[in-house]
Amino acid sequence: MKLHATSTQQYQTVTGYDDSGVEINAVHYSRSLLVMPETPPVDWPVSSFDALNAQDFAQIEAANPDVVILGTGARQRFIHPKLIAALTARRVGVEAMDNQAACRTYNILMAEGRRVALALILETPAA
């Protein structure tokens, strides 16, 4: 689904998504990534929701967001509180939702000027 007809270069905007991945400023990504409004997307070494660990969230914490939108794949899944304890201790909100909802929510919060991180899990097929 295309979200925006044109991309913005000032901020990292989700411009589309489908089953094969996500577009950030019209660039297609097919691997898990972290997106913040003012910095280019970075790889996030998460192959599946079940593979998440506390170290994966340390990478997000280093970006110093106010809120984290976690895209859990094709369906919404809930994260164990111990995995996000460091973020919670810093009063960083973490919301888990399916990838499509996560992309839309990120764009809304980004447009509001919030310091939001999109942590998107794009599952890697088993080899």
Which residue stretches match the model-derived regions?
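C-terminal structural segments of small proteins and small subunits
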Residues: 93-122
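Short glycine-/small-residue-rich flexible loop motifs, especially phosphate/cofactor-binding loops
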Residues: 19, 84, 106
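Mid-chain, well-packed structural core segment of small domains
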Residues: 61-97
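Short active-site-adjacent helix-start/loop capping segments
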Residues: 43-44, 76-79, 105
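Non-catalytic interface/targeting segments
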Residues: 1-52, 63, 111-127
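Short, charged beta->alpha transition segments
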Residues: 53-59, 105-106
